[in-house]
Amino acid sequence: MDIKDYMQNLGCRARKVSRVLARAGAEEKNQALEMAASFIEKESQALVEANHKDLAAGRSKGLDEALLDRLTLTEARIAVMAEGLRQIASLPDPVGAISELSYRPSGIQVGRMRVPLGVIGIIYESRPNVTADAAGLCLKSGNAVILRGGSEAFHSNQAIACCIHQGLEQAGLPQEAVQVVETTDRLAVGALITQEEHVDVIIPRGGRSLIERISQEAKIPVIKHLDGICHVYIDDRADLDKAVAIAVNAKCQRYGVCNAMETLLVAREIAAEILPMMGEHYCSAGVELRGCPETQGLLPHIEPATEEDWYTEYLAPLLAIRIVAGLDEAIEHITHYGSHHTETIVTEDFTRARRFLTEVDSSSVMVNASTRFADGFEYGLGAEIGISTDKLHARGPVGLEGLTSQKWIVLGNGHIRE
């Protein structure tokens, strides 16, 4: 198989059917999603059997238990995957929505219409449920999609795609609307991210090395985030009960997610009061702490934090703690070491909260709330394709609207420009 020719063929077919999807109605798209969900439930045993092939191959390659868990499809996870497609079907269709329509002095009406991006390439690792989630979101937003999953989930992804294709067929939509790359050759990634004539945007979901490679080599716009180095700053005017609850939840609810806190900043004026309490909570949760010299003075049992720690997304029960003079130093630290993902201030001071919201340059900035809320579902977007820390085109959780663009529309009645 010539990989370049194969990928060009996928791109060409995707571009062709993207025009069909752009004019498809919400009823057709929703029917396809509902039918795909039904086929996923109906074929659950076939999905489990395909997944067993991937798990056996993974074990033979020595994949660790965490990776194997992300790879595993159970009956319960398959049911959640099907329900996810139904939830996407229940969301409002963004395509065709007109906004900001107004009359101009010339008499014309000018507004903006939401339209699909066209063809989306999604490159991801391990989790086979991404195949269904990504296909569903792209379909509902009127986009054709080319999915390149991780080689470790090859059989699972193909089986899920088969169910989605059946759903598309039942709804009278082309199966090429969702194409899964049928090769594990790594050259396929390079061929996909350089197809500027066929593919409009690339969305990578995976580890830092994958995203860095795609960012450097792609000839197509990329929607991405590299790291989730999220901060919680406890101000000296914070409610201590709120501060403890937020800082514990932000770190301990789930470790291996991009919106978990990785660095805790504490105002010097309240550090002696709150850090011993925080230390007890983290110790009981099994979180390893690393701190600046001042923090070590209050928590002598912890390890020293290095310069590298401030730049690290742990995705593990590890936390770096730094005592800062106040809000200015906290913002300076976040600006220098942060990844523009999610930051929170805990304070009862309205002016300081407004300053934090205004001056911190991240995709989500919060007041008195856990960083774990940085999520499309929690924001009312429904499902999300990922979180973007870029400033163009989408920023923060990327849901259906983030997979569309806008074009200007002008309505006249024989108007000519004088």
UniProtKB/Swiss-Prot annotation:
<dbReference type="GO" id="GO:0004350">
    <property type="term" value="F:glutamate-5-semialdehyde dehydrogenase activity"/>
</dbReference>
<dbReference type="GO" id="GO:0055129">
    <property type="term" value="P:L-proline biosynthetic process"/>
</dbReference>
<dbReference type="GO" id="GO:0005737">
    <property type="term" value="C:cytoplasm"/>
</dbReference>
<dbReference type="GO" id="GO:0050661">
    <property type="term" value="F:NADP binding"/>
</dbReference>
<dbReference type="InterPro" id="IPR020593">
    <property type="entry name" value="G-glutamylP_reductase_CS"/>
</dbReference>
<dbReference type="InterPro" id="IPR016163">
    <property type="entry name" value="Ald_DH_C"/>
</dbReference>
<dbReference type="InterPro" id="IPR015590">
    <property type="entry name" value="Aldehyde_DH_dom"/>
</dbReference>
<dbReference type="InterPro" id="IPR000965">
    <property type="entry name" value="GPR_dom"/>
</dbReference>
<keyword id="KW-0641">Proline biosynthesis</keyword>
<comment type="similarity">
    <text>Belongs to the gamma-glutamyl phosphate reductase family.</text>
</comment>
<keyword id="KW-0521">NADP</keyword>
<dbReference type="InterPro" id="IPR012134">
    <property type="entry name" value="Glu-5-SA_DH"/>
</dbReference>
<protein>
    <recommendedName>
        <fullName>Gamma-glutamyl phosphate reductase</fullName>
        <ecNumber>1.2.1.41</ecNumber>
    </recommendedName>
</protein>
<dbReference type="InterPro" id="IPR016161">
    <property type="entry name" value="Ald_DH/histidinol_DH"/>
</dbReference>
<keyword id="KW-0963">Cytoplasm</keyword>
<dbReference type="Pfam" id="PF00171">
    <property type="entry name" value="Aldedh"/>
</dbReference>
<comment type="function">
    <text>Catalyzes the NADPH-dependent reduction of L-glutamate 5-phosphate into L-glutamate 5-semialdehyde and phosphate. The product spontaneously undergoes cyclization to form 1-pyrroline-5-carboxylate.</text>
</comment>
<keyword id="KW-0028">Amino-acid biosynthesis</keyword>
<comment type="pathway">
    <text>Amino-acid biosynthesis; L-proline biosynthesis; L-glutamate 5-semialdehyde from L-glutamate: step 2/2.</text>
</comment>
<dbReference type="InterPro" id="IPR016162">
    <property type="entry name" value="Ald_DH_N"/>
</dbReference>
<keyword id="KW-0560">Oxidoreductase</keyword>
